[in-house]
Amino acid sequence: WDPIVRAIDGSPLADPASKVHVIFVPSYLDDRDGIFDKSYYELLVGMDLTLFPSYYEPWGYTPLESIAFSVPTVTTTLAGFGLWIDRREEHPGVAVLCREDGNDDEVASALADAVLRFSQLDAARVEEMRRAAGVLSKEALWSRLFEAYEEAYALALDNADVRMNHVASNATPLPEQQVKLVHQALRPERPEWNRMMVEKNLPERLRPLEELAHNLWWCWNPGARDLFEEIDPDLWNRSERNPIAFLDLLTINRLKELERDESFLASLDAVYAQFKSYMSEKPDPATPKIAYFSMEYGLHASLKIYSGGLGILAGDYLKEASNKNVPMVAVGLLYRYGYFTQKLSAQGAQQATYEAQNFSKLPISPVRDELGNWTTVQIALPGRTLSARVWRCQVGRTDLFLLDPEGTIRFVKIGYLSLIHISEPTRRSYIS
């Protein structure tokens, strides 16, 4: 059923006598894949040439990584990196193919030609190409790119000023703008439905599990992960390894069993003591503080506020800052619909499925002011102001503040139950 396997079967590539052999390993290269058992970078440095013929990449850091390791590469004009390279008069070590929506056959032929040309180079020329690739990668060092970043940021501010000055209540939209405000008012004669969600409280002896579940420290510490899985391996997998959802699904009988399980309680106490010791360490007050902004953070699959590798990279920065005890504060966006789930149809076509996140099952909590009010921030946009509530996500010692522009939520305590009352605003503005 795999389209790559189908394309190879029956082609000259499947001929044992062919000089070209394909090793197709659709696996994450984490040194435990069962085929190579080496990390991506260990394999990368052993390559003669890498191919990244992207159909779309805002930047595409894989070919840049390749030349940083002095491995020549092939990319396309549909990758930001490819466009950046192609603007240079000379770029030895990087071949850039012109790719468009309808020229797949042309790109395939050009890709084959690029591989053939490289294979015909003598050893001296290959070594020259490798050195040139390494030198070219230095052009992308942050020390060089930061000046261009400042220019781009200044240009964005200038353009924002133009829009702010143009937009008024009776202003005519710019020709290139298509802004439509749709107001929806609730009818007073119709019933208003509100959602109620019940949160369970764990027995006192097991309360540390709740604290661990609400700090993502657990997701990169094997002892904490194993602790949750030990409780009920099948349920842990069914809850998609989300400890908050997992604890909500535990039966009262299982909780009582855990309260009497001395071996489990000893493991819980050990992990909790490790966590408290970790959290008690504070950064040096004299250390410069860092504010980190990103559109996405890949911290764990249960918190769907990322879509790819750059989000994972941003998430790793937060975890590393926590481990290094760097005083960093991160700011991002809380998406109701995170990354989509990919499925394949019977014909092999990719289908995207979007699932709404249940915020009550996420390791986030409202940020409140000294009066107990939910903290909100106002962001000035052309012709309007956007209000967003602030949530806090604890990533070890690092605080991640997530902005959420949806309706208001009110927490109500009734006995041992925590009820979350969600009230939608009576009037909304939609932009399409």
PLM regions: where:
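Nucleotide-activated donor-binding/catalytic signature segment of Leloir-type glycosyltransferases, i.e.
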Residues: W1-E42
